[in-house]
Regions:
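Feature captures the catalytic ectodomains and active-site-proximal regions of enzymes
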Residues: 1-175
Length: 175
């Protein structure tokens, strides 16, 4: 295990230097995400944490050089600073809320809408008439067909999980 950034990279470097047989190493560093939530993505705290992470990662790549290792870095989500004013609250849009079978699902930056049978046109008209400047409205089948969630064949249950429509906020907006 590890508790500090340096310890995390030391553990990974130790595995790379050990000459052990092929293995999969997963490491997660939550500090950048935590600081972004607490201070905002443009804060000095986030910039300093990112610089430290970047420098430690560069040192790891130096260690990995020549080790026949594949290093992949990924993120589980992006960052956005937003405000209360940028939030679309369904309580402010009862004409939209009444078309929904369930509350919006998914996440604030990609909401899934389950629309009551027979209310699809009202839902579409309401979103286009009142929120078009703040959200993209996409039919769920188009999200899948256009590959928004990745290539390949979608799991059979995915279509049901997306609801009928996907709402993707523009700019700093969240739902």
């Amino acid at each position: 295990g590890y508790e500090t950034l340096d310890e995390m990279f030391a553990v990974i470097a130790g595995i790379l230097r050990s000459g052990a047989p092929r293995s999969y190493v997963y490491a997660y560093w939550p500090q950048l995400d935590s600081l972004a939530h607490e201070h905002g993505i443009h804060s000095d705290a986030v910039a300093e944490a990112f610089a430290a992470l970047d420098a430690a990662f560069a040192r790891l790549l130096d260690t990995a050089h020549g080790s026949d290792s594949l290093v992949i870095v990924t993120a589980d989500h992006g960052f956005i600073d937003t405000t209360v004013e940028a939030t679309i609250d369904l309580d402010d849009h009862p004409e939209l809320r009444e078309t929904l079978l369930l509350p919006l699902c998914g996440e604030p930056r990609m909401a899934y809408a389950y629309v009551r049978a027979g209310r699809e046109r009202q839902f579409e008209n309401t979103v286009r008439g009142r929120l078009a400047d703040r959200v993209h409205l996409i039919r769920s089948e188009d999200v899948l067909r256009q590959g928004w969630l990745g290539p390949g064949t979608a799991h059979p249950a995915l279509r049901d999980r997306l609801g009928d429509y996907v709402l993707i906020p523009r700019g700093q907006t969240i739902l």
